[in-house]
Amino acid sequence: MSGSDKTYQLDETTLYSVLNLKYGATEVQIRKAYMKLARELHPDKSKSEEAGELFKKVAHAHFILTDKKEKMKYDSKLLAKGLYDYSPRIPNDKSRQNGMFKDTAKNSKTFTNNNNKDDASADTSKSKPRKSRPYEEQPYGFGVDTGRGSGKNIPLFKTFNAKSYQNSKKSVTPPRPKQPSEKNKRATSFSNENRNSSSVPLAKNQAKKTANSGSAVGSESRISSSGSESSSNVNSATGSSEEPDVHTQHKMARKDSYLSGFQSKARSPESPFQDPAQRHFVRTKYVSSRYDKRSLSPVKTTPNSSTETLNNVKNIFNSMSDRLRHTLFGNSNGDAEDEDQHNTQHDTERLFKRAKLPGRKILTDEEIDEIVKQQNEAESNDPDRQDYGNSFNLNVDNLSVNTQDFNHISEPSPEKEETKANKAPFLEEVYEIKSDNEHLEEKAAVSPDDGIDTLGLNELGETLPNNKEPFDMRNVGDSLDNYQVKRMKVSPKPRSVPSKTTPGSSHAEENLQEPVNIPLPRIYKLDPIPIEKFNVDLSISNIKLPEMPNLLCNVLDKAQVLECQQKTAEFTKQTNETKRKLLHILSQRCSADEELHDKLYRVENVNRMVEAKLYDLELMTKLSELLNRQRMVAENYAIMINTMYASGLLEKN
C-alpha cells in the first residue's frame, strides 16, 4: 500500500488533541504520542505532501507542550476557553486498523482469484484481533464473522468437516512443553521466515528436525511424518486457520543468559519470588530507596520524651569531652578499660562551662619559640606527671587551659610527650570538665553575683517543656500587633434589612457594625471659639458720651457769644475722641469676623456669633447717638452765628 492510498487525520482543536491526548497529559505521554505520530507522518517515512504538513503541526504541538513556560500559558488559555475537558475525536487504536490513516483503496479492490482471497484474509487477520470462543459459543449462519482467518472464505456449497474445525482450534490451546531434545533449540527470525516461505507444511519440517537430531527412530519418524502430512493436507484442503497462524508468528525475544541461568535453578517452595532474579531486583530497589532516607544527624531517631532528649544531649557532650581529652593528653592502648569505667561512672551528669577568653593576640615567631622552650624545661624538670587532679595550666599571655577530674588517666608514653612538647596549643574556646563533688562545692562557694551562668543537666530537665503538655496559643496574639491579618469584609452574621427612614430622622437606633444602605451619622467633633477671639471689649458700657453744651445766650452780648463758641469747640473735641475709640473697637470686630469665618457658622459657635452681633449693634448705637449730639450742637451754633451775621454785629466786630 503506497503513501498516496492513505488519508491522514488530525484533530486540530487543541494541541493536546493534535497528539491524540487529553488535557493534563504528562511529559512521558506527550513524548510517546509524538514519537508514534512522527513514525507515520515524518517526510522520511511518508511520501505524501499532506503528511509533511501534518508533521509540522505535530512538531509545533510537541514543542509547546514540552516547554514548561509555554505549556503553562497554553493551559491557562484552555482553562479560559473551557477546552480543558476536550477529548480528541480521532478513534483510538482498537477501532482503527492502520494507525492515523484510513485504507481507502481496500474498499475499492475486488479479488478474483484464490491468491487475492488469501491476501485479503491475511490483511483482515492482522488488523482485527482473533476471536477465541469455545465450541458451544461458536455462531452459525450466513454473514457471521467467526474470526477464523481464511475459514470465512469457504464456499457455501462446501460441507462442514468436524475434524478440520477441531484442528483449527488447536492454536487456542496452550503450547505443549518442549521435549528434552528440543531444549537447546532457539527459534529465530530466520527459521520463521523459512517456515513462512517454504511450501512444505509445518509438521513435515518438524519431522526433518527430529530426524537430523537423531533422537527418534527413523521408522517412527517416517510414520509420524506421513501421518502429519495427511493431516496437513486435510487441513489445507478444508481451509483451516492453522497455516495463517504460522505466517503471523513474530520474532521471539532473545532471552538473557543471566536470567536464564537463574531460571534453570530450582525455586524454593517457601520463597515468594518466582526466580532469584526477581528477588535480587526487589532487594536492590529497596536498598536504593532507603539509601537517600538515611539520617545524618547524631540523633538517629526522634525522641519520644524529654528523658530521651536529655540522654542524647549527655551523649553529645560526653563525646565532645572525650575528643578534647584525647587532643590534650592523648590516649594509650592500655588505658581502654580505665576509660570505659570512667565513661560509665560519669555518663550520668556533667557540668560544662564555656570559659570566655579575652581578645586573641597574634604571637610572633620569637614568642612561640620561647613558649616551646618553657614547656620543654617544665616537662624535663617534672618527669613524674601522674597527678592530673590539680590543674594543667599553660600561662601564655592570652592562653589558659583548665582541666580537672583526670586522676584515672595513667602516665602517657614518652613518645607522645615529645610530640606534645613540639605543639603550641592555640585554643579559642575551652570546656572545663568538673566532677560531681567539685560541682557541688563550687556551687556552694560561688555567689549569684559572680556573673557566671551555670546550668546542670538536672535543672535543664526541669526547665525543658514536656512534650505531652500542649502549647498555649491564647497569648500568641499579644506579640502580633503589627502583623496585618486579612479580615472578612462581610460579617458572617445574617444581614438585617434596614428600615427606610426619612432624611430628618435620627440614626441613633442603627448599629454601626452592620452594613446599611443609608448614610451613617458623622462622628462630630466640637471646636468652640472662646469669647476673647471675637475681640469683644466689655468695657464699652463704661464709655460715657459728652454732654451737649447750652448755647442760649444774648447775641448782643459779645462775651456770651465767645463763651458759647468755646463750649462748642470743647464738645467737638470730646466727641471726636469717643468716636475714634468706638470706630477702633468696631474695626477689630470686623477683622475678628474675617479670621473666624470658617468656624463661625458651626453649631457650637452660633450663639457666640449672635452675642458678637449684639455687641456690634451696641457699638453702633453709641456711635450714632454721639453723631446725633454732634449734629444738634453744630446746628445750634450755626443758628447763633447766622443771627449775629444778620444783625450786623459780626461785621462790626
Curated annotation (Swiss-Prot):
Region called Disordered, residue ranges: 85-308, 490-512
Low complexity: bias regions: 213-241
Cellular component terms (Gene Ontology): cytoplasm; nucleus
UniProt subcellular location: Cytoplasm; Nucleus
A Pfam family recorded for this sequence: DnaJ
CDD domains in alphabetical order: DnaJ
SUPFAM superfamilies: Chaperone J-domain
Key words, A-Z: Chaperone, Cytoplasm, Nucleus
Protein name in UniProt: J protein JJJ2
Gene name as annotated: JJJ2
